[in-house]
Structures are given as structure tokens and as C-alpha cells.
A protein has these predicted regions:
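Active-site regions of metal-assisted phosphoester/phosphodiester hydrolases
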Residues: 1-136
């Protein structure tokens, strides 16, 4: 979140987000290089507070680059890079992402729901879900 800690003068805009991105990349890179886990199948999913569809719609450019380069370098692939504003007429981009190790592949298209007008929605974000299978 861009303004985390800004109003309290505890951080600059995007400062905490950039630190969180760097921490995630470091943790996952360490995990992938650990001999105990080097062959593990890993799914990382959550709110990354950045669009990865090429639009630069939301997020910090430096953090976005470090996230993509770091996780790709650690052997992860992102399954939520689709520009759903173009392909599915959504009103906002995906900021919640699903990353997996290369040995996990989607078995069907990405599921996305974007109904911001639904009275019982749980988030202001688009929902994303994906069915995966281990690569044979």
C-alpha cells in the first residue's frame, strides 16, 4: 500500500511496500536455494499491490521490477499477468497474484471475478483463482 506509515510520518510513500517486496524475494530465493527445498513445489499467492500486466496501472516501478526479476530468477512464474481491463472489460487491473515454481501448470484458464457492485464483496480487489497440476 503506497501510503502505509506515511500519515504517521513513519515512512515515505511506497517505502514499506518496497521493503516487503525485497523481503519476499529474499525469502523465496533462499528457500529455492536450500537443498532441502530446491525440488519443492511452491505456490505464492496474495496481495502484491502492483499490476503486472504491462500497464503500470498501480504499484511502484522499482518494486515491480525487483519482484518480477527476483521471482523469475528464483524459478517462479506468474500466472496473473493478463491485462483483464483489455481482455475481460474489468474496471481495474489484477494486484493479487499467483506465482508458482515451473513444475506447476494451470489446468484451466484463470478464474477472475470483478463485481465491485456486489453488496457482500469481501475486498476492493478483483478475485483470482487457478487450478494447478504438477508437470509430468
Amino acid at each position: 500500500y503506497a501510503m502505509d506509515g506515511v500519515r504517521q510520518k513513519a515512512a515515505l510513500a511506497w517505502e514499506r511496500h518496497q521493503k516487503a517486496v525485497d523481503d519476499v524475494v529474499a525469502d523465496l530465493s533462499d528457500r529455492r536455494s536450500d537443498p532441502e527445498f530446491v525440488d519443492s513445489r511452491i505456490v505464492v499467492a496474495g496481495d502484491f499491490n502492483t499490476s503486472l500486466d504491462g500497464s503500470n496501472w498501480y504499484g511502484h516501478p522499482g518494486a515491480r521490477s525487483r519482484l518480477v526479476e527476483g521471482l523469475n530468477g528464483a524459478g517462479f512464474q506468474c500466472h496473473t499477468r493478463e491485462n483483464i481491463r483489455l481482455t475481460r472489460a474489468a474496471d481495474r487491473a489484477i494486484v493479487d497474484h499467483i506465482w508458482t515454481t515451473a513444475d506447476l501448470l494451470p489446468v484451466e484458464p484463470l478464474h477472475i471475478w470483478c463485481d465491485r457492485s456486489h453488496p457482500n464483496r469481501l475486498s476492493d480487489h478483483n478475485g483470482v483463482a487457478l487450478s494447478l497440476a504438477a508437470k509430468e
